[in-house]
A protein has these predicted regions:
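Short, internal active-site loops enriched in acidic
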Residues: 19-21, 93-94
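Structural motif
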Residues: 22-30
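Short, solvent-exposed coil/turn linker segments
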Residues: 21-22, 126
Length: 167
């Protein structure tokens, strides 16, 4: 979706994100090493984690204010070293509603990218605030269109339905 906001004649978006990865597992699986090979001088590198870092499995878990910050610093520092321009981003808001109120599900992870960006003097985008505002504007029912949510039989590729939010 992000890449659809740019004129393809002027901006190339090379999305290397992978579902389910944390700041730790993306490095441990060698995915970051592959991305580094692609970074050229002047490239903007958008770095967004936190969505899966709170998972309890040791392959993905990081600690905000500690290991999570260390990984974000590694991404940003290595991007700078390669001549790229790192942009740290907070995680997008999850669709988690309780009694008609959107509930934060990222805790301290949502704040750490800002802290790290400031400490390194690099760019920062508060994707959590932007997406949280959009979720709230659309409301609990309307925000479904932002997510992978289909009832059984509604979409051929998901015959049994699918719901990717946290309720």
């Amino acid at each position: 979706m992000f890449q659809n906001n740019f004129n393809k004649n002027f901006v190339v978006v090379n999305n290397q994100a992978l579902n389910g990865r944390s700041s730790k597992s993306f490095i441990d699986e060698g995915k970051w090493a592959n991305v580094k090979k692609l970074i050229k001088k002047g490239d903007y590198v958008l770095i967004q984690f936190g969505h899966n870092d709170a998972k309890t499995d040791t392959a993905r878990h990081t600690i905000p204010g500690s290991t999570f910050d260390q990984y974000l610093k590694q991404y940003a520092s290595e991007t700078l070293k390669l001549g790229g321009i790192p942009v740290l981003m907070s995680p997008c808001a999850r669709r988690k509603w309780k009694n008609g109120v959107l509930v934060d599900s990222h805790g301290d992870y949502r704040l750490r990218a800002k802290v790290v960006a400031k400490s390194l003097n690099v760019h920062y985008i508060d994707a959590n605030a932007i997406t949280e505002k959009l979720e709230k504007q659309l409301g609990e029912e309307g925000s479904k269109k932002l997510h992978l949510i289909y009832a059984a039989g509604e979409k051929a590729s998901y015959p049994n339905g699918v719901e990717d939010n946290i309720m």
